[in-house]
A protein has these predicted regions:
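Donor-binding and catalytic core of enzymes assembling or modifying cell-surface/extracellular glycoconjugates
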Residues: 1-72
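Glycine-rich phosphate-binding loop signature in dinucleotide/nucleotide-binding domains
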Residues: 41, 130, 134
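Nucleotide-sugar donor-binding patch of glycosyltransferase catalytic domains
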Residues: 18, 25-26, 57-131
Length: 135
């Protein structure tokens, strides 16, 4: 899911091209109501600190949360804390030269390169663990 911006559309296309099986790219193709229904039916959702993470938590759908720009202890999916990939402390140190204890509570790291600290391998490892635990 995502909006109509060029960057979101490009990300959706890039992600969907990496799969060997057929993937339906729904970037800019769902309403909020449709997105909520999709999340409700999903086994789990992978997303950053965003609306879908909060919708999934409300629907009791597991969330693999991708956090580097915000602190998941403040805004993370409280029902899926064990599935969060948390690089907020690493991003604070690398990009701001600060410990998270030095940052104001709720501070967002507004540098897009923070999310690059999360590797595909980490996400795949979380998916594998979640699937093993759930099935």
């Amino acid at each position: 899911t995502g909006g109509a911006s060029e960057i979101e559309l490009n990300y959706g296309n890039q992600i969907s091209h990496h799969f060997k099986s057929q993937v339906k790219n729904l970037v800019n193709q769902t309403s909020l109501k449709e997105l909520t229904a999709l999340i409700y039916k999903a086994d789990f959702v992978i997303c950053p600190d965003s609306g879908p993470a909060h919708i999934a938590t409300a629907m009791k759908t597991k969330v693999i949360g991708l956090y580097a720009m915000s602190n998941p202890m403040r805004s993370g999916p409280y029902l899926s804390k064990n599935w969060v990939i948390n690089h907020y402390p690493k991003a604070a140190k690398k990009l701001l030269n600060k410990e998270i204890s030095e940052l104001k509570w709720g501070y967002r790291i507004k540098k897009s390169e923070a999310m690059n600290l999360i590797t595909p391998e980490e996400v795949i490892a979380k998916i594998d663990l979640l699937v093993l635990e759930s099935y």
